[in-house]
Amino acid sequence: PQQATRWFDATADHPSTYCNPMNLSYCFRANLPDLVKNGSFRSTADPMMVMYKGEYFLFATNQAGFYYSKDLSNWEFVFAGFQRYPEDDDLCAPAAFVSGDTLFYTGSTYAGLPIWYSTNPKSGKFKRYVEKTALPSWDPAFLLDDDGRLYMYYGSSNEFALKGVELDRRDFHPISKIQEIMMLRPEEHGWERFGMNNDDSTTLAPFTEGAFVTKHNGKYYFQYGAPGTEFKVYADGVYVSDKPMGPFTYQKHNPMSYKPGGFVQGAGHGGTFKDAYGNYWHVATCMLSLKYKFERRIGLYPTAFDKDGVMYSNTAFGDYPLLTPKGKVDDIANTFSGWMLLSYGKPVMASSMDSTLVPENVTDESMRTFWSARSGEPGEWLQISLEGLKEVRAIQLNYYEHRAVQHNKAMDLYHQYRIYHSIDGQNWELVVDKSDNDKDVPHDYIELREPLKTRYLKIVNEHVPSGNFAMSGFRIFGNGLGEAPAAVKNLKVERSKADKRNAMITWEPVKEAYAYNIYYGIAPDKLYNSITVLGDTMY
């Protein structure tokens, strides 16, 4: 039977932190030849979230359902599939809004989809409010304004503008002229350019999609994703207006949600919502793009509006443990737990290795590399040395699907394991026991009940949902019990004379620093964007 330890008790697991990517039961993709030629994989994208009856409901692409949580950390899955044919999407880039005690829900369509509704969504049952929407709307988003008027924003294209329209709440038919809201201007906005580093001006024109509108202090903030979901620079920008249908003006600080570096990369095509305490959050799409270009995960980032009405998100340390809300936050820069990464580049051993999938891949801070054991059998293990006594506060286990045979959603998927620690590498003590776990936790995050001072950590497999025991990241967080690195010196920015949208940033290496955060913005007090650089002194 599963044991509680002084560091972890599965029956009383109420963490005060969470860690991106979000630990959701990501659905496996359908068994279609163009999707799975490199093997079965999980994915979702295009998330949005609403509060309904005091809980958070998260909707995202092709999940055969949705997720709900009371605390933004522990998530439960509800099966609510709408797929009609095996080759169809379930719901792509879904949209939802709440009116009174009713949750309304739909997905992307070029041919018309129902508008579903429910007053008990956790049952997974929905009724049809409208049999078929009147407009072909891909990537829809709704805004129910304070005056009761309903608006829809939509579009996904590298050729056409994103649009907005007012809808009749009785039948969801348009009752206004369809307005073109915005198009990309990559010639002016360098971050909107196509490519992994905004560096491809020849393959395709950049894409814009994922319209979403947030109303704050009487202003309408129109958010949009660009330049492509398969890139680490995928981000959300924002335009602002005094009216729900515009005209909208490009915000000087852009993109407002941006994360091109670190373990989790990409922060585009998302949605903004308020928590129970009035804090804003932005839930966004993260790139993985290993087995397939549209292989993706989801991240959740604190978001705010400054005294000048500038909308921004905080993605600095955005894939480290972040504090879950317990009240109103005065400054979203203070949502970082302070627990640093202890596992980057550290030595790793394993029970076995499948081909060239080496254990070192779990400590390189790349979600796009992974280690795999030769099997998924109980007893396969992975061990890390922290190269000295460290204070461990949290552990993130990023599983990867290697040789998996699962497709679509199944309700019998779960992970089971035990984690041990040792100071000398010889004598081991149980830290975390999830040998009875019945949840699917592909990015499991464990916050320890008290600090653990140790040198070695080992995870022993008991069960994986499908395929081999494989991981892209065995990430250990805490404190190194040493001195903090000194501040960076000799920071230089060289702007390209040929193209002022480009710049090279360099700095001197700092002893004992394993990574750097570059902060930048439109003013000294608005350095809202951050780029994490690991093991290098240039970007």
Q: What does each model-identified segment do?
A:
Residues 163-174, 330-364:
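Predominantly extracellular/luminal regions of secreted and cell-surface proteins
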Residues 517-539:
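Recognizes extended acidic, P/S/T-rich segments that occur
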Residues 237, 415, 442-445, 535-539:
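Short S/T/G- and acidic-enriched coil/turn segments that sit immediately N-terminal to beta-strands
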Residues 364-432, 442-487, 498, 506-508:
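Aromatic, loop-rich ligand-recognition surfaces of beta-strand-rich domains
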Residues 494-500:
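Short, solvent-exposed loop/linker segments at the N-terminal edge
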Residues 165, 417-419, 516-518:
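Short beta-strand elements bearing conserved aromatic residues within extracellular beta-rich modules
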Residues 2-203, 215-262, 277, 285-330, ...:
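Beta-rich carbohydrate-recognition and catalytic domains
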